[in-house]
């Protein structure tokens, strides 16, 4: 695999203006496929969820999945699109082994949703409006697995296996209009846009939205034009990018590659590209086809979809609060700073914090536990924080043990470890591990006497007015009591013992 020459991103931005475009494919989580009764289930044995309609057997007829149509309308509404009162399916004709019918049932000039927009908030709060050209319904293709090659791609493979379980799974393809004016923030905008689409479809409940499973896939189009020129440049399309980080890096790389090609005096080739995460680069795929090459024509086996205004309004009434509006509401209610709230969102614990507050914790307590303890443990385990098994009720119970003085913060982290290890509830773990705070002054005074005797110089400093030196004595007591002393009470007793006012 050869990697093309690139210009530095900064040099590219000095000379050229990037124009972006995205086609995001969203797999719908319906029980059955788009046009057949075959199950829509991820991860089953290859070629077990497939029937005659999916394979295009002679004499079989497709039937439109009503739930898929409703999900498509919901997506269109969430993207501020107009919903077509009348739309049709079309056949997109091409031959490839993962398309057993030799055509894909899609929509061409009559999509179900069109002319929308989505406001994207970047990390610094800048809002960038992305205009949506269309959102149309179609079916997914099967999945090819290339065997024998080093990179799992068709190049160099000995043979390929095809799994038709995915063939016919409902898709909504969301196509943007050309995105101009992003400048050096184009890669950041690309990532934020796909993240917003993923968040919206997950919030709607119409897709599992797991990019690692291919539920959300992005084709990223990039072209460059010299500053001041109106006409668009030749674009490339990086296909099936399946992570947010990869979308950002792929757009950045293509900008740098295009700039190097243009600087060399060579023409940019209109083509598809493949993204390689290991080298963070793209390689050439095939010449990019135009719509005419697919010979679209209306699907003769399916009747048009008529979305009455009453039906559309019924679906609109079921839409949940938009994610952006919800974030704004929660930020104001919780009183977090911009940075604090951004960290919460980026860590993926906003829902968990909301549930913890609803369970009885304060906003600050919920953030302290989720951001201060649980997110870090999730990173170490390389899982999502929600997958650790810590419930809002656990956080509330754990924090109450601290507030009631039964355990201190250090013990609380040990209790949390016990919860993660499946040892029981916080109260049960405190009892099993013997983690109660030492509240009897007798043992504390004994430990204080020992600590003062071991550090007489520190004791003299405290008597002399250097009260900040008390930390060393407190530390000695905490060590002697295996962290089970109340540090605040220990400090009070030390000052009383030395006759010093704190």
From Swiss-Prot:
Pfam families: GatB_N (PF02934), GatB_Yqey (PF02637). One of its GO terms (molecular function) is asparaginyl-tRNA synthase (glutamine-hydrolyzing) activity. One of its GO terms (biological process) is glutaminyl-tRNAGln biosynthesis via transamidation. Its EC number is 6.3.5.-. Residues 272-293 are annotated as: Disordered. Keywords: ATP-binding, Ligase, Nucleotide-binding, Protein biosynthesis. It catalyses: L-glutamyl-tRNA(Gln) + L-glutamine + ATP + H2O = L-glutaminyl-tRNA(Gln) + L-glutamate + ADP + phosphate + H(+); L-aspartyl-tRNA(Asn) + L-glutamine + ATP + H2O = L-asparaginyl-tRNA(Asn) + L-glutamate + ADP + phosphate + 2 H(+). Belongs to the GatB/GatE family. GatB subfamily. Allows the formation of correctly charged Asn-tRNA(Asn) or Gln-tRNA(Gln) through the transamidation of misacylated Asp-tRNA(Asn) or Glu-tRNA(Gln) in organisms which lack either or both of asparaginyl-tRNA or glutaminyl-tRNA synthetases. The reaction takes place in the presence of glutamine and ATP through an activated phospho-Asp-tRNA(Asn) or phospho-Glu-tRNA(Gln). Heterotrimer of A, B and C subunits. This is Aspartyl/glutamyl-tRNA(Asn/Gln) amidotransferase subunit B. The gene is gatB.
